[in-house]
Curated annotation (Swiss-Prot):
Broad class of where this protein is predominantly found: secreted
Gene Ontology CC annotations of this record: bacterial-type flagellum; extracellular region
Location in or out of the cell: Secreted; Bacterial flagellum
Name used for this protein in its record: Flagellin B
InterPro entries given in the database record: Flagellin, Flagellin_C, Flagellin_C_sub2, Flagellin_hook_IN_motif, Flagellin_N
Keyword Phosphoprotein part of the UniProt annotation: no
Species of provenance: Vibrio cholerae serotype O1 (strain ATCC 39315 / El Tor Inaba N16961)
Coiled-coil portions: 103-129
Similarity field: Belongs to the bacterial flagellin family.
Pfam families on file: Flagellin_C (PF00700), Flagellin_IN (PF07196), Flagellin_N (PF00669)
Family annotation (NCBIfam families): PRK08869.1-1 (NF006466), PRK08869.1-3 (NF006468)
Molecular function in Gene Ontology: structural molecule activity
Record keywords, A-Z: Bacterial flagellum, Coiled coil, Secreted
Length: 376
Protein backbone atom coordinates (compact mmCIF):
# COMPACT_ATOMS: atom_id res chain seq x y z
CA UNK A 1 0.00 0.00 0.00
CA UNK A 2 1.35 3.41 -0.98
CA UNK A 3 2.35 5.78 1.80
CA UNK A 4 1.22 9.39 1.27
CA UNK A 5 0.52 12.47 3.32
CA UNK A 6 -1.89 14.58 1.27
CA UNK A 7 -4.74 12.04 1.12
CA UNK A 8 -5.55 9.71 4.02
CA UNK A 9 -8.15 7.39 2.48
CA UNK A 10 -8.33 5.17 5.56
CA UNK A 11 -9.19 8.12 7.78
CA UNK A 12 -11.82 9.31 5.30
CA UNK A 13 -13.44 5.86 5.26
CA UNK A 14 -13.44 5.65 9.05
CA UNK A 15 -14.88 9.16 9.23
CA UNK A 16 -17.70 8.20 6.87
CA UNK A 17 -18.69 5.19 8.92
CA UNK A 18 -18.38 7.21 12.13
CA UNK A 19 -20.79 9.81 10.74
CA UNK A 20 -23.24 7.06 9.75
CA UNK A 21 -23.08 5.52 13.22
CA UNK A 22 -23.57 8.94 14.84
CA UNK A 23 -26.58 9.62 12.59
CA UNK A 24 -28.03 6.22 13.51
CA UNK A 25 -27.49 7.01 17.20
CA UNK A 26 -29.23 10.35 16.80
CA UNK A 27 -32.25 8.79 15.06
CA UNK A 28 -32.55 6.02 17.64
CA UNK A 29 -32.40 8.49 20.52
CA UNK A 30 -35.00 10.70 18.81
CA UNK A 31 -37.35 7.75 18.29
CA UNK A 32 -36.87 6.46 21.83
CA UNK A 33 -37.40 9.86 23.44
CA UNK A 34 -40.41 10.87 21.28
CA UNK A 35 -42.09 7.48 21.15
CA UNK A 36 -42.55 7.84 17.39
CA UNK A 37 -40.52 6.11 14.72
CA UNK A 38 -41.74 8.70 12.18
CA UNK A 39 -40.79 12.19 13.37
CA UNK A 40 -40.43 13.90 10.02
CA UNK A 41 -41.28 13.26 6.39
CA UNK A 42 -37.73 12.05 5.66
CA UNK A 43 -38.25 9.12 8.04
CA UNK A 44 -41.19 7.75 6.00
CA UNK A 45 -43.09 10.15 3.75
CA UNK A 46 -45.87 7.69 2.86
CA UNK A 47 -46.17 6.44 6.43
CA UNK A 48 -46.42 10.01 7.75
CA UNK A 49 -49.23 10.80 5.33
CA UNK A 50 -51.17 7.67 6.24
CA UNK A 51 -50.69 8.17 9.98
CA UNK A 52 -51.86 11.78 9.73
CA UNK A 53 -55.04 10.64 7.96
CA UNK A 54 -55.62 8.05 10.64
CA UNK A 55 -55.02 10.70 13.32
CA UNK A 56 -57.68 12.91 11.74
CA UNK A 57 -60.08 9.98 11.60
CA UNK A 58 -59.40 9.07 15.23
CA UNK A 59 -59.94 12.64 16.43
CA UNK A 60 -63.15 12.79 14.40
CA UNK A 61 -64.36 9.56 15.97
CA UNK A 62 -63.59 10.93 19.45
CA UNK A 63 -65.67 14.01 18.70
CA UNK A 64 -68.46 11.88 17.22
CA UNK A 65 -68.65 9.92 20.48
CA UNK A 66 -68.87 13.19 22.41
CA UNK A 67 -71.63 14.42 20.10
CA UNK A 68 -73.54 11.17 20.49
CA UNK A 69 -73.26 11.35 24.28
CA UNK A 70 -74.56 14.93 24.16
CA UNK A 71 -77.49 13.70 22.07
CA UNK A 72 -78.26 11.00 24.62
CA UNK A 73 -78.09 13.57 27.42
CA UNK A 74 -80.56 15.83 25.60
CA UNK A 75 -82.93 12.93 25.02
CA UNK A 76 -82.65 11.82 28.66
CA UNK A 77 -83.37 15.35 29.89
CA UNK A 78 -86.44 15.67 27.68
CA UNK A 79 -87.67 12.17 28.47
CA UNK A 80 -87.36 12.79 32.20
CA UNK A 81 -89.51 15.91 31.90
CA UNK A 82 -92.02 14.00 29.78
CA UNK A 83 -92.27 11.38 32.50
CA UNK A 84 -93.55 14.06 34.86
CA UNK A 85 -95.83 15.36 32.10
CA UNK A 86 -97.33 11.87 31.87
CA UNK A 87 -97.88 11.78 35.64
CA UNK A 88 -99.69 15.13 35.50
CA UNK A 89 -101.91 14.05 32.60
CA UNK A 90 -102.76 10.83 34.42
CA UNK A 91 -103.77 12.85 37.48
CA UNK A 92 -105.90 15.15 35.34
CA UNK A 93 -107.60 12.12 33.81
CA UNK A 94 -108.34 10.74 37.27
CA UNK A 95 -109.91 14.06 38.21
CA UNK A 96 -111.99 14.08 35.01
CA UNK A 97 -113.35 10.64 35.82
CA UNK A 98 -114.05 11.73 39.38
CA UNK A 99 -115.93 14.79 38.17
CA UNK A 100 -117.98 12.66 35.74
CA UNK A 101 -119.62 10.88 38.66
CA UNK A 102 -123.16 11.99 39.36
CA UNK A 103 -122.55 12.12 43.12
CA UNK A 104 -120.58 15.37 42.78
CA UNK A 105 -122.23 18.72 43.35
CA UNK A 106 -121.48 21.82 41.29
CA UNK A 107 -119.23 23.20 44.03
CA UNK A 108 -117.29 19.94 44.20
CA UNK A 109 -116.76 19.98 40.44
CA UNK A 110 -115.51 23.56 40.64
CA UNK A 111 -113.02 22.50 43.32
CA UNK A 112 -111.83 19.68 41.07
CA UNK A 113 -111.49 22.14 38.20
CA UNK A 114 -109.22 24.33 40.33
CA UNK A 115 -106.77 21.45 40.70
CA UNK A 116 -107.03 20.71 36.98
CA UNK A 117 -106.18 24.34 36.21
CA UNK A 118 -103.18 24.23 38.56
CA UNK A 119 -101.95 21.04 36.90
CA UNK A 120 -102.39 22.66 33.49
CA UNK A 121 -100.17 25.55 34.62
CA UNK A 122 -97.52 23.10 35.80
CA UNK A 123 -97.61 21.33 32.42
CA UNK A 124 -96.78 24.60 30.71
CA UNK A 125 -94.09 25.48 33.26
CA UNK A 126 -92.33 22.17 32.63
CA UNK A 127 -92.56 22.68 28.87
CA UNK A 128 -91.14 26.21 29.09
CA UNK A 129 -88.30 25.54 31.54
CA UNK A 130 -86.93 22.18 30.42
CA UNK A 131 -83.66 22.97 28.65
CA UNK A 132 -80.20 21.62 27.84
CA UNK A 133 -77.24 23.86 27.19
CA UNK A 134 -79.50 26.87 26.77
CA UNK A 135 -81.80 25.14 24.27
CA UNK A 136 -85.45 24.83 25.26
CA UNK A 137 -86.56 21.28 24.59
CA UNK A 138 -90.32 21.04 25.06
CA UNK A 139 -91.87 24.41 24.23
CA UNK A 140 -91.85 23.87 20.47
CA UNK A 141 -88.72 25.90 19.73
CA UNK A 142 -86.36 22.90 19.49
CA UNK A 143 -87.77 21.68 16.18
CA UNK A 144 -85.31 19.36 14.43
CA UNK A 145 -81.58 19.35 15.05
CA UNK A 146 -78.83 17.22 13.54
CA UNK A 147 -76.24 15.32 15.55
CA UNK A 148 -72.92 14.50 13.89
CA UNK A 149 -72.13 10.92 14.88
CA UNK A 150 -69.44 10.13 12.33
CA UNK A 151 -65.88 11.18 11.55
CA UNK A 152 -66.83 12.58 8.14
CA UNK A 153 -69.41 14.98 6.74
CA UNK A 154 -72.85 13.62 5.95
CA UNK A 155 -72.92 11.25 8.93
CA UNK A 156 -75.61 13.10 10.89
CA UNK A 157 -78.84 11.95 12.57
CA UNK A 158 -81.87 14.19 13.06
CA UNK A 159 -83.72 14.54 16.36
CA UNK A 160 -87.13 16.19 16.42
CA UNK A 161 -89.12 17.27 19.46
CA UNK A 162 -92.50 18.94 19.45
CA UNK A 163 -94.20 21.14 21.98
CA UNK A 164 -95.46 19.61 25.21
CA UNK A 165 -97.44 22.69 26.14
CA UNK A 166 -101.06 22.02 27.01
CA UNK A 167 -102.30 24.33 24.26
CA UNK A 168 -100.55 22.58 21.38
CA UNK A 169 -102.91 20.90 18.93
CA UNK A 170 -100.91 17.67 19.06
CA UNK A 171 -102.12 17.42 22.66
CA UNK A 172 -105.75 17.72 21.60
CA UNK A 173 -108.04 17.20 18.65
CA UNK A 174 -111.44 18.24 17.30
CA UNK A 175 -114.72 18.27 19.18
CA UNK A 176 -118.16 17.90 17.58
CA UNK A 177 -121.33 18.57 19.58
CA UNK A 178 -124.98 18.18 18.80
CA UNK A 179 -126.64 21.51 18.11
CA UNK A 180 -129.57 20.71 20.37
CA UNK A 181 -129.98 18.49 23.39
CA UNK A 182 -132.41 15.60 23.42
CA UNK A 183 -134.89 14.89 26.16
CA UNK A 184 -134.21 12.02 28.52
CA UNK A 185 -136.95 9.96 26.87
CA UNK A 186 -135.68 10.52 23.31
CA UNK A 187 -135.39 7.36 21.25
CA UNK A 188 -134.52 6.45 17.68
CA UNK A 189 -137.84 6.45 15.81
CA UNK A 190 -136.96 3.85 13.20
CA UNK A 191 -133.93 1.86 12.10
CA UNK A 192 -131.42 4.29 10.64
CA UNK A 193 -127.71 4.96 10.45
CA UNK A 194 -124.99 7.45 11.38
CA UNK A 195 -121.77 7.61 9.36
CA UNK A 196 -118.38 8.99 10.33
CA UNK A 197 -115.95 9.65 7.47
CA UNK A 198 -112.36 10.74 8.10
CA UNK A 199 -108.71 10.15 7.30
CA UNK A 200 -106.66 8.39 9.95
CA UNK A 201 -103.13 9.29 11.06
CA UNK A 202 -101.66 6.91 8.49
CA UNK A 203 -103.43 8.78 5.67
CA UNK A 204 -106.00 6.05 5.07
CA UNK A 205 -109.64 6.95 4.37
CA UNK A 206 -112.05 5.49 6.91
CA UNK A 207 -115.83 5.33 7.13
CA UNK A 208 -117.63 4.01 10.18
CA UNK A 209 -121.34 3.21 9.87
CA UNK A 210 -123.46 2.93 12.99
CA UNK A 211 -126.70 1.03 12.41
CA UNK A 212 -129.14 2.11 15.09
CA UNK A 213 -132.38 0.28 15.71
CA UNK A 214 -135.71 1.64 16.77
CA UNK A 215 -135.81 2.49 20.46
CA UNK A 216 -132.09 3.14 20.95
CA UNK A 217 -131.24 6.17 23.10
CA UNK A 218 -128.21 8.51 22.99
CA UNK A 219 -126.19 6.47 25.47
CA UNK A 220 -126.60 3.40 23.30
CA UNK A 221 -125.55 5.37 20.23
CA UNK A 222 -122.40 6.48 22.06
CA UNK A 223 -121.73 2.86 23.02
CA UNK A 224 -122.11 1.76 19.39
CA UNK A 225 -119.65 4.40 18.20
CA UNK A 226 -117.06 3.60 20.86
CA UNK A 227 -117.42 -0.09 20.09
CA UNK A 228 -116.74 0.29 16.37
CA UNK A 229 -113.84 2.74 16.33
CA UNK A 230 -110.97 3.80 18.54
CA UNK A 231 -110.36 6.91 16.45
CA UNK A 232 -113.50 8.84 17.45
CA UNK A 233 -114.83 8.86 21.01
CA UNK A 234 -118.48 9.54 21.82
CA UNK A 235 -120.14 10.63 25.07
CA UNK A 236 -123.36 12.28 26.24
CA UNK A 237 -123.54 15.36 28.42
CA UNK A 238 -126.08 16.12 31.12
CA UNK A 239 -127.78 18.45 28.66
CA UNK A 240 -128.68 15.54 26.39
CA UNK A 241 -126.16 16.46 23.70
CA UNK A 242 -124.18 13.77 21.92
CA UNK A 243 -120.53 14.83 21.58
CA UNK A 244 -117.71 13.35 19.54
CA UNK A 245 -113.97 13.82 19.92
CA UNK A 246 -111.31 12.96 17.32
CA UNK A 247 -107.75 13.01 18.68
CA UNK A 248 -105.02 14.63 16.59
CA UNK A 249 -102.99 11.49 17.27
CA UNK A 250 -105.53 9.35 15.40
CA UNK A 251 -107.37 11.54 12.88
CA UNK A 252 -106.07 13.97 10.28
CA UNK A 253 -108.38 16.89 9.58
CA UNK A 254 -112.15 16.87 10.04
CA UNK A 255 -114.68 14.13 10.62
CA UNK A 256 -117.68 14.26 8.28
CA UNK A 257 -120.86 13.19 10.07
CA UNK A 258 -123.67 11.89 7.89
CA UNK A 259 -126.45 9.35 7.63
CA UNK A 260 -130.04 9.67 8.78
CA UNK A 261 -129.12 10.18 12.43
CA UNK A 262 -126.39 12.62 11.55
CA UNK A 263 -128.97 14.89 9.96
CA UNK A 264 -131.52 14.39 12.72
CA UNK A 265 -129.15 15.09 15.59
CA UNK A 266 -127.36 17.92 13.78
CA UNK A 267 -123.76 18.54 14.77
CA UNK A 268 -121.91 21.84 14.99
CA UNK A 269 -118.72 22.30 12.99
CA UNK A 270 -115.68 20.79 14.64
CA UNK A 271 -113.73 23.03 16.98
CA UNK A 272 -110.12 22.61 18.01
CA UNK A 273 -109.68 21.66 21.65
CA UNK A 274 -106.54 20.91 23.66
CA UNK A 275 -105.60 20.02 27.22
CA UNK A 276 -105.69 23.75 27.96
CA UNK A 277 -109.45 23.67 27.20
CA UNK A 278 -110.24 20.88 29.65
CA UNK A 279 -113.13 21.89 31.87
CA UNK A 280 -114.44 19.35 34.35
CA UNK A 281 -116.98 21.63 36.01
CA UNK A 282 -119.74 19.88 34.01
CA UNK A 283 -120.46 16.24 33.22
CA UNK A 284 -120.19 16.92 29.48
CA UNK A 285 -116.85 18.66 29.96
CA UNK A 286 -115.59 15.84 32.17
CA UNK A 287 -116.57 13.21 29.60
CA UNK A 288 -114.82 15.10 26.83
CA UNK A 289 -111.81 15.74 29.07
CA UNK A 290 -111.17 12.01 29.39
CA UNK A 291 -110.97 11.68 25.59
CA UNK A 292 -108.76 14.77 25.27
CA UNK A 293 -106.38 13.53 27.97
CA UNK A 294 -106.22 10.06 26.42
CA UNK A 295 -105.10 11.69 23.17
CA UNK A 296 -102.57 13.85 25.03
CA UNK A 297 -101.15 10.81 26.80
CA UNK A 298 -100.76 9.08 23.46
CA UNK A 299 -98.94 12.14 22.08
CA UNK A 300 -96.50 12.16 25.01
CA UNK A 301 -96.01 8.39 24.85
CA UNK A 302 -95.28 8.62 21.13
CA UNK A 303 -92.64 11.31 21.69
CA UNK A 304 -91.10 9.37 24.56
CA UNK A 305 -90.93 6.25 22.39
CA UNK A 306 -89.07 8.23 19.73
CA UNK A 307 -86.62 9.52 22.32
CA UNK A 308 -86.10 6.01 23.66
CA UNK A 309 -85.35 4.73 20.17
CA UNK A 310 -83.00 7.68 19.65
CA UNK A 311 -81.09 6.86 22.84
CA UNK A 312 -80.80 3.19 21.94
CA UNK A 313 -79.61 4.05 18.43
CA UNK A 314 -76.97 6.42 19.77
CA UNK A 315 -75.87 3.84 22.33
CA UNK A 316 -75.18 1.37 19.53
CA UNK A 317 -73.54 4.13 17.49
CA UNK A 318 -71.15 4.88 20.36
CA UNK A 319 -70.23 1.19 20.69
CA UNK A 320 -69.47 1.02 16.98
CA UNK A 321 -67.49 4.28 17.06
CA UNK A 322 -65.39 3.01 19.96
CA UNK A 323 -64.68 -0.22 18.09
CA UNK A 324 -63.70 1.61 14.89
CA UNK A 325 -61.56 4.07 16.86
CA UNK A 326 -59.76 1.22 18.59
CA UNK A 327 -58.84 -0.37 15.25
CA UNK A 328 -57.84 2.97 13.71
CA UNK A 329 -55.51 3.72 16.62
CA UNK A 330 -54.04 0.23 16.43
CA UNK A 331 -53.29 0.76 12.73
CA UNK A 332 -51.78 4.18 13.38
CA UNK A 333 -49.63 2.76 16.18
CA UNK A 334 -48.21 0.06 13.92
CA UNK A 335 -47.25 2.70 11.36
CA UNK A 336 -45.91 5.49 13.57
CA UNK A 337 -45.15 4.35 17.12
CA UNK A 338 -41.66 3.27 18.16
CA UNK A 339 -40.94 -0.43 18.63
CA UNK A 340 -38.74 -0.10 21.72
CA UNK A 341 -37.31 -3.62 21.50
CA UNK A 342 -36.14 -3.06 17.93
CA UNK A 343 -35.00 0.52 18.51
CA UNK A 344 -32.91 -0.24 21.60
CA UNK A 345 -31.21 -3.00 19.59
CA UNK A 346 -30.53 -0.52 16.78
CA UNK A 347 -29.17 2.03 19.26
CA UNK A 348 -26.84 -0.54 20.84
CA UNK A 349 -25.56 -1.47 17.39
CA UNK A 350 -25.02 2.22 16.54
CA UNK A 351 -23.14 2.76 19.82
CA UNK A 352 -20.80 -0.16 19.12
CA UNK A 353 -20.20 1.00 15.55
CA UNK A 354 -19.57 4.54 16.76
CA UNK A 355 -17.00 3.36 19.29
CA UNK A 356 -15.34 1.09 16.75
CA UNK A 357 -15.26 3.82 14.09
CA UNK A 358 -13.75 6.25 16.57
CA UNK A 359 -10.99 3.78 17.44
CA UNK A 360 -10.28 2.98 13.79
CA UNK A 361 -10.22 6.68 12.89
CA UNK A 362 -7.66 7.33 15.61
CA UNK A 363 -5.42 4.61 14.18
CA UNK A 364 -5.96 5.78 10.57
CA UNK A 365 -4.83 9.28 11.51
CA UNK A 366 -1.45 7.80 12.55
CA UNK A 367 -0.74 6.30 9.09
CA UNK A 368 0.88 9.46 7.52
CA UNK A 369 3.45 9.54 10.36
CA UNK A 370 5.12 6.52 8.76
CA UNK A 371 6.49 8.90 6.11
CA UNK A 372 8.59 10.63 8.79
CA UNK A 373 10.48 7.44 9.60
CA UNK A 374 11.42 7.12 5.94
CA UNK A 375 12.79 10.68 5.92
CA UNK A 376 14.85 10.11 9.08
Amino acid sequence: MAINVNTNVSAMTAQRYLNGAADGMQKSMERLSSGYKINSARDDAAGLQISNRLTSQSRGLDMAVKNANDGISIAQTAEGAMNETTNILQRMRDLALQSSNGSNSSSERRAIQEEVSALNDELNRIAETTSFGGNKLLNGSFGSKSFQIGADSGEAVMLSMGSMRSDTQAMGGKSYRAQEGKAADWRVGAATDLTLSYTNKQGEAREVTINAKQGDDLEELATYINGQTEDVKASVGEDGKLQLFASSQKVNGDVTIGGGLGGEIGFDAGRNVTVADVNVSTVAGSQEAVSILDGALKAVDSQRASLGAFQNRFGHAISNLDNVNENVNASRSRIRDTDYARETTAMTKAQILQQASTSVLAQAKQSPSAALSLLG
